[in-house]
Amino acid sequence: MKPELRIDILKDITSKVDVPLVLHGGSSNKDEEIAAAVDNGICKINISSDIKVAFYTQCRKTLNENPGYREPLEIYPEAMEACGKVVEEKIRLFKSNDKVKYYY
């Protein structure tokens, strides 16, 4: 069962509190729902599972294509690249691509 965000409830919460809101378990939500959540007060989104899925999916693919691989340096580079792509997509989805200026 896929998660479904209740943006109507989020709007109600946002109108009543003045604190940054966190979406725990943001993995597997539709991009449209995540974008709407960001537009309605969500400031932090936990997406560890989305990153892990990209990692282990690519590890499996690499190992299936190269059954003789045993060394992490043979297996992990493409998996790490897959993780990076997910992170880049999520940064844009969360409208956080301009936030680095606050940290450097």
Please provide the spans of the model-predicted regions.
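Active-site mouth loops of central-metabolism enzymes
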Residues: 22-24, 76-77
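Alpha-helical scaffolding segments of alpha/beta enzyme cores, especially the outer helices
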Residues: 8-12, 36, 85, 89
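Catalytic cores of alpha/beta
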Residues: 26-42
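Alpha-helix-loop-beta-strand connector modules within alpha/beta enzyme cores
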Residues: 2-23
